[in-house]
């Protein structure tokens, strides 16, 4: 018996007695006796199916209450269709092995559908045991309290182990919300090696790494409670953090807190948070009346925080009923789906039924009971648990300071002020309740950050109403968390830090500053007066009435009363573009100045010797080019407005000076107009101005039209001031008062309010921050009734003196000024720079008008000097070397500017070449009409082509010109240079052979001339009918072509005349090229008549200058000659005679003269006259070959010779034979001392020869020729002429050339080109010069 009853003997009877007691008391019969039995289908109350739930308690504390729980829980939990039958069982064993054995024995002897478990041991091993049993038997097990609320390992597969408590992760989440709410971002984690400490540290890492809050984790301390108090104290002091999160077993908490107290890490300034179910609720079972003591009896430190379930103060029956309700609601769902309650496992040693548990698990995951959500996650914890934050007070009781509902934390204010002394616990002597009122920029209220749910660092938490109760009633509104910042909030934070107090900030409910209504004060003043608040701060104005009931600090902001209005947009006048100048200036400008200056310019131009008066006086064509007064006005008008319109510029120097001064005047006029126009074109903004509150607009608003509408915010100091001083004004403005400042500003912008009267500090801020800067305070922020903002305190408060001293310190340290720049500044400024825009009057523009008057006076002086020089002084200037030097210097300056290449050194003259006999060109048909060429395009082109480069063309001409003259484009050369010309053709129509290659020639001088004619040329045929036509030369002789070096183009409306030159000197006769006109050929007349060697260039013989000056006899000579004779002379002008010299010798000409008087002349030569008889004139062979000397219209002799057909003039007395007589007949008197003469220089003596031809009785005395474009060096080769007798009759005079080499056959006079301008001595054409434009 001993062996059988040895050690197990005492346990056997006890176990048997327990099982018998359970069997006798069990409400679950093994088998139903009948249809109405308990076990049959119809068992239970009223046909409801029985639901057996085991209530298992572990610990001796539950023995007294376990027997009474069954009926109470069954009555609390009622489920339709189920008969809930709870059975309470108490387990004495506390170790894990004993607990497992007892539970397995219990389940094997009972048929239950669920288990509700609670223990008071808080042993961490209980949860894994229950989780294993649920997975093994598929029974739903609900843990409601104790150590079962901690899962140390992942749940077993198929387990339905559910927990109503909070997990470590959920507790840490709530704790971090509290830390974030109070800006406690720096902390340290303290843990022991208790089960679950690694999960605790990992959860902390997850929460801090993924948060937007800047957490400062100082590290983790892993303590060994058995190491001794000194070691623990040293470890706790090693980390300087005032927030500490503790995770340990309940037995390990006592040595940790003793070491912290020894190290001075508890009490004021330090906060401890306990994490884990074994520490939650403090000592004991957490009952409401149980003191929070450690297991050893030591008290917990004050200020300790913990997180518990919301029902932590509920009794045992209510906690158990919640667990039974979870099982009942899940069973009801099973019965609804399957129609019966499935049989669950009751044997712990049976085969695992995990697959069945997985299918039943989902019925218990989403439960709702008693208006509470019991939804569980995969770990078996509630998804949305209802938690509370409890704190240990000084009276050693737990206080609920916050709640956690639906993932939202709500805290009771205050715990400790964020901006008081750091983490000081609540001290009634140093804690203040502060009331404030929202009013920008002094107090700005904003919601909390939507992401983090906290206030940013420059703001503080503030609530909407005051709540002093610890446990507010359920129907009371919860305080809404807001964030306050602004100018006054920054001052409050500085005061709290300087003086050393904590505060609780809240907003007044009525939103007023303070006013006494029916004997009761409201607003912030009422909160302080009735002692609901210790202090009131904000835009609170100090006045006499308020100072009677409360004390005010020194003012920290100067303010008063100001008036704000809105800018109204103006309109732009239709005549705004005329407003920059006064009407007098406009009249002076366009009526007087423009007209007077235009008439002045026209008069100067008309009377100018170089102006358009010659065209008016001598123009043969009606409607010719004239500078009229209309053109003068048009020119000045275009200069005023900078319009690029076609205008005709004056030519006179005086007129040009006047136009230049007018242009300068126009620049000043237009610039002043443009600069002043912007001020008048903008929309002028209208701002109503008042002088103060006593202004007539405020005192008598009905007299205005429309009446002025103004108001203020009632119940403030502004309304009090107006009511006391201006009662009539107050009674009028009551209808326009606004409830808030923001609404008043909206009414101002909408035009429903004309003026708003309020505190100056607030209005100045609103004006600076207004969008669009449409609001402005009158008088640049003018303040009336100056006062200030102060802090309201109780009468006789002990805080007044410290606050006054602190505010004075802030003012002295410029902290207040810094805050004003931060909060009270804006982008809109009232002190706008006033732009004084006024019309420019005569006084403003007098200077430019004076300038015009001075310019007109100077122009008169220039005008007089110009006429004096032209008519008097220029004839008194004799030929001097100074003039030659000036002309040469002018040419050199032009050559530098035009990048003219330096001429190569002179080469020795080549031997003279024999001249071929001239061949008569074949007659050609009359030329067709030439295209019209504008007058300004008629030009003389001078260039040199490379010998042997082929026939001349348009491209070659342009290239040759630009190679020599550079990139300049002289007026009128555009048409001549760019036109391509066809290759010359012979009589048979075949192209002529290119000329033979010749040695390179020296570059020509840099000069050209553009001749402008006034009338179209007359047809050449029929001008001299008395001249017979010469015989045609052989056609085959038109092969030798010389390159044209100069082309003289006249502006003709008639077809151009054919070539008429009797020699082909390409340098002295520029139009003798193939393209110059007509077919030509080479060959000689008379078989092989030897040509005399020319004496020019290499050996210049004495040769007088040919007098080719036009005279009025041109028309008479043309009429005397028949058109047939002139037509017969046309073929004599061809260009197929080669120039006898290989190259031009000597430097370029150094002096140039006008060529406008030479437009109708061409030169001939004695030696190249065709050997035929008939009327002819004597020519100097060398002087006739001058380069730019035009050929004469005709060579004139006496009418006797003309009447005789082919004439033979008598020889002079100094000559013998026929030839000297011919030369004498064409001579002219050498000297006329009483008249100005043209100078002819000779190599021997440079004695000038002056003569002027005048018309006399029986003859013509022609005026001297104007100086030509020939250089004086070429003219110097002509010797002084011998005396000649004066000819009579309308004849052309010519110098005799006494040199022997100048003898030759006579030449009939060339084709006459009618002169369009009349007498060249009284006419000036439009000649343009490249290096010098002068008239001598």
Curated annotation (Swiss-Prot):
A motif (PDZ-binding) lies at residues 1334-1336. Residues 28-582, 675-843 are extracellular. The gene is GRIN2D. Changing residue 592 to L: Found in a patient with autism spectrum disorder; uncertain significance. Pfam families: ANF_receptor, Lig_chan, Lig_chan-Glu_bd. Glycans are attached at residues 92, 352, 366, 384, 467, 569. The record marks 642 as: Functional determinant of NMDA receptors. Residues 631-650 are annotated as: Pore-forming. Component of N-methyl-D-aspartate (NMDA) receptors (NMDARs) that function as heterotetrameric, ligand-gated cation channels with high calcium permeability and voltage-dependent block by Mg(2+). Participates in synaptic plasticity for learning and memory formation. Channel activation requires binding of the neurotransmitter L-glutamate to the GluN2 subunit, glycine or D-serine binding to the GluN1 subunit, plus membrane depolarization to eliminate channel inhibition by Mg(2+). NMDARs mediate simultaneously the potasium efflux and the influx of calcium and sodium. It is found in: Cell membrane; Postsynaptic cell membrane. Keywords: Calcium, Cell membrane, Disease variant, Disulfide bond, Epilepsy, Glycoprotein, Ion channel, Ion transport, Ligand-gated ion channel, Magnesium, Membrane, Methylation, Phosphoprotein, Postsynaptic cell membrane, Receptor, Signal, Synapse, Transmembrane, Transmembrane helix, Transport. Heterotetramer. Forms heterotetrameric channels composed of two GluN1/zeta subunits (GRIN1), and two identical GluN2/epsilon subunits (GRIN2A, GRIN2B, GRIN2C or GRIN2D) or GluN3 subunits (GRIN3A or GRIN3B) (in vitro). In vivo, the subunit composition may depend on the expression levels of the different subunits. Interacts with PDZ domains of PATJ and DLG4. A hydrophobic region that gives rise to the prediction of a transmembrane span does not cross the membrane, but is part of a discontinuously helical region that dips into the membrane and is probably part of the pore and of the selectivity filter. Residues 981-991, 1035-1044 have a biased composition (Low complexity). Changing residue 527 to G: In a breast cancer sample; somatic mutation. The modification Phosphoserine is found at residue 1326. It catalyses: Ca(2+)(in) = Ca(2+)(out); Na(+)(in) = Na(+)(out); K(+)(in) = K(+)(out). The keyword Calcium applies. PANTHER family: IONOTROPIC GLUTAMATE RECEPTOR. Changing residue 845 to V: Increased glutamate and glycine agonist potency. It comes from Homo sapiens. Disulfide bonds join 104-348, 455-483, 462-484, 773-828. This is Glutamate receptor ionotropic, NMDA 2D. It comes from the Eukaryota. Residues 900-934, 981-1123, 1225-1336 are annotated as: Disordered. The keyword Cytoplasm does not apply.
């Amino acid at each position: 018996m001993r062996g059988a009853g040895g050690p197990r003997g005492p346990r056997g009877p006890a176990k048997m007695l327990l099982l018998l007691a359970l069997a006798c008391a069990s409400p679950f019969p093994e088998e139903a006796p009948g249809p109405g039995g308990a076990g049959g289908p119809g068992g239970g109350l009223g046909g409801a199916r029985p639901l057996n739930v085991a209530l298992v308690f572990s610990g001796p504390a539950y023995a007294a209450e376990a027997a009474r729980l069954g009926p109470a829980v069954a009555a609390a939990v009622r489920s339709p269709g189920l008969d809930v039958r709870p059975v309470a069982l108490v387990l004495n064993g506390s170790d894990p092995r004993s607990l497992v054995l007892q539970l397995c024995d219990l389940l094997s002897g009972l048929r239950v559908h669920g288990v509700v478990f609670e223990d008071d041991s808080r042993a961490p091993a209980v949860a894994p045991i229950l989780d294993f049993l649920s997975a093994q038997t598929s029974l739903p097990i609900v843990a409601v309290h104790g150590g079962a609320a901690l899962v140390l390992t992942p749940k077993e597969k198929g387990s339905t182990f559910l927990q109503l408590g909070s997990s470590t992760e959920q507790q840490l989440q709530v704790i971090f919300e509290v830390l974030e709410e109070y800006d406690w971002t720096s902390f340290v984690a303290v843990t022991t090696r208790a089960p679950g400490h690694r999960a605790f540290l990992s959860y902390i890492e997850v929460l801090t790494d993924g948060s937007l809050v800047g957490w400062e984790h100082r590290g983790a301390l892993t303590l060994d409670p058995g190491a001794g108090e000194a070691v623990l104290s040293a470890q706790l002091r090693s980390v300087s953090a005032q927030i500490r999160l503790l995770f340990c077993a309940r037995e390990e908490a006592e040595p940790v807190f003793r070491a912290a107290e020894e190290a001075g890490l508890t009490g004021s300034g330090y906060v401890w948070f306990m994490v884990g179910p074994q520490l939650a609720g403090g000592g004991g079972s957490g009952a409401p009346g149980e003191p929070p003591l450690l297991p050893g009896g030591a008290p917990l430190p004050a200020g300790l925080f913990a997180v518990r379930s919301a029902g932590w103060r509920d009794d045992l029956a209510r906690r158990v009923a919640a667990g039974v309700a979870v099982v009942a609601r899940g069973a009801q769902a099973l019965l609804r789906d399957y129609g019966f309650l499935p049989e669950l496992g009751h044997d712990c040693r049976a085969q695992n039924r995990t697959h069945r548990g997985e299918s039943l698990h989902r019925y218990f995951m989403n439960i709702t009971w008693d208006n509470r959500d019991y939804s569980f996650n995969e770990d078996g914890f509630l998804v949305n648990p209802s938690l509370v934050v409890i704190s240990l007070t000084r009276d050693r009781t737990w206080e609920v300071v916050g709640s956690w509902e639906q993932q939202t934390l709500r805290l009771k204010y205050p715990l400790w002020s964020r901006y008081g002394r750091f983490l000081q616990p609540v001290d009634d002597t140093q804690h203040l309740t502060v009331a404030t009122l929202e009013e920008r920029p002094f107090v700005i209220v904003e919601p909390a950050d939507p992401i983090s749910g906290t206030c940013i660092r420059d703001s503080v938490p503030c609530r909407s109403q005051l709540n002093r109760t610890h446990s507010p009633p359920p129907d009371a509104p919860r305080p809404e968390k807001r964030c306050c910042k602004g100018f006054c909030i920054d001052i409050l934070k500085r005061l709290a830090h300087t003086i050393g107090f904590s505060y609780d900030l809240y907003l007044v409910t009525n939103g007023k500053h303070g006013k006494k209504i029916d004997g009761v004060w409201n607003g912030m003043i009422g909160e302080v007066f009735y002692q609901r608040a210790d202090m009131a701060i904000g835009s609170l104005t100090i006045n006499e009435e308020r100072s009677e009931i409360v004390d005010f600090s020194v003012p920290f902001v100067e303010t008063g009363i100001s008036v704000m209005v809105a800018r109204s947009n103006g309109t732009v006048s239709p005549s705004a573009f005329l407003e920059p100048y006064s009407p007098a200036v406009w009249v002076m400008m366009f009526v007087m100045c423009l007209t007077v200056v235009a008439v002045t310019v026209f008069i100067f131009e008309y009377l100018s010797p170089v102006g358009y008066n010659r065209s008016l006086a001598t123009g043969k064509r009606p409607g010719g080019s004239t500078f009229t007064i209309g053109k003068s006005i048009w020119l000045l008008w275009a200069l005023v407005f900078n319009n690029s319109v076609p205008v005709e510029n004056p030519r006179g120097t005086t007129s040009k000076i006047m136009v230049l001064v007018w242009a300068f005047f126009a620049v000043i006029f237009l610039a002043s107009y443009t600069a002043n126009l912007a001020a008048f074109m903008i929309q002028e903004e209208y701002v109503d101005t008042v002088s103060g509150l006593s202004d007539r607009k405020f005192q008598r608003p009905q007299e205005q039209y429309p009446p002025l509408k103004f108001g203020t915010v009632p119940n403030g100091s502004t309304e009090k001031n107006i009511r006391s001083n201006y009662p009539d004004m107050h009674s009028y403005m009551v209808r326009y008062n606004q409830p808030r400042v923001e609404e008043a500003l909206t009414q101002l912008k909408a035009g429903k309010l004309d003026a708003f009267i309020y505190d100056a500090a607030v209005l100045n801020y609103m004006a600076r921050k207004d969008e669009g800067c449409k609001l402005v305070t009158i008088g640049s922020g003018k303040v009336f009734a100056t006062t200030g903002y102060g802090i309201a305190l109780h009468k006789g408060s002990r805080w007044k003196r410290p606050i006054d001293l602190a505010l004075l310190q802030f003012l002295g340290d410029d902290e207040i000024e810094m805050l004003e720049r931060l909060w009270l500044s804006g982008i809109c400024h009232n002190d706008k720079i006033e732009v004084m825009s006024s019309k420019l009057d005569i006084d403003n523009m007098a200077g430019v008008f004076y300038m015009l008057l001075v310019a007109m006076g100077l122009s008169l002086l220039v005008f007089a000097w110009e006429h004096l020089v032209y008519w008097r002084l220029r004839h008194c200037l004799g030929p001097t070397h100074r003039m030659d030097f000036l002309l040469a210097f002018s040419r050199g300056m032009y050559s530098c500017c035009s990048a003219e290449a330096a001429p190569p050194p002179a080469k020795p003259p080549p031997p003279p070449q024999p001249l071929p006999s001239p061949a008569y060109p074949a007659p050609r048909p009359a030329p067709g009409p030439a295209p019209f060429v504008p007058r300004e395009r008629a030009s003389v082109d001078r260039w040199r082509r490379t010998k042997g480069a082929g026939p001349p063309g348009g491209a070659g001409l342009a290239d040759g010109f630009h190679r020599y003259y550079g990139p300049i484009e002289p007026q009128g050369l555009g048409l001549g240079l760019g036109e391509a010309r066809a290759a010359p053709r012979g009589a048979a129509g075949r192209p002529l052979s290119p000329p033979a290659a010749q040695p390179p020639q020296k570059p020509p001088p840099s000069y050209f001339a553009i001749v402008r004619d006034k009338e179209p040329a007359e047809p050449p045929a029929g001008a001299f009918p008395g001249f017979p036509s010469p015989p045609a030369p052989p056609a085959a002789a038109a092969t030798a072509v010389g390159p044209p070096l100069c082309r003289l183009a006249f502006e003709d409306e008639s077809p151009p005349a054919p070539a008429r030159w009797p020699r082909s000197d390409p340098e002295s006769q520029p139009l003798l090229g193939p393209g110059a006109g007509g077919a030509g050929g080479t060959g000689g007349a008379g078989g092989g008549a030897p040509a005399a060697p020319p004496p020019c260039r290499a050996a210049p013989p004495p040769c007088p200058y040919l007098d080719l000056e036009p005279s009025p006899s041109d028309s008479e000579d043309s009429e005397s000659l028949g058109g047939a004779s002139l037509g017969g002379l046309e073929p004599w002008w061809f260009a197929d005679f080669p120039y006898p010299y290989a190259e031009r010798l000597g430097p370029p000409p150094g002096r140039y003269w006008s060529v406008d008087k030479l437009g109708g002349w061409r030169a001939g030569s004695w030696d190249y006259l065709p050997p035929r008889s008939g009327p002819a004139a004597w020519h100097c062979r060398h002087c006739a070959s001058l380069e730019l000397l035009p050929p004469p219209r005709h060579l004139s002799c006496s009418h006797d010779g003309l009447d005789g057909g082919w004439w033979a003039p008598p020889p002079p007395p100094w000559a013998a034979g026929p030839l000297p007589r011919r030369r004498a007949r064409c001579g002219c008197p050498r000297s006329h001392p009483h008249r100005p003469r043209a100078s002819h220089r000779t190599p021997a003596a440079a004695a000038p020869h002056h003569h002027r031809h005048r018309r006399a009785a029986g003859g013509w005395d022609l005026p001297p020729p104007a100086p030509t474009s020939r250089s004086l060096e070429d003219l110097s080769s002509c010797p002084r002429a011998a005396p000649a007798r004066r000819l009579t009759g309308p004849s052309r005079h010519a110098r005799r050339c006494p040199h022997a080499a100048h003898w030759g056959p006579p030449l009939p006079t060339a084709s006459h080109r009618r002169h369009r301008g009349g007498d060249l001595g009284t006419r000036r054409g439009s000649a343009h010069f490249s290096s010098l434009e002068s008239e001598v």
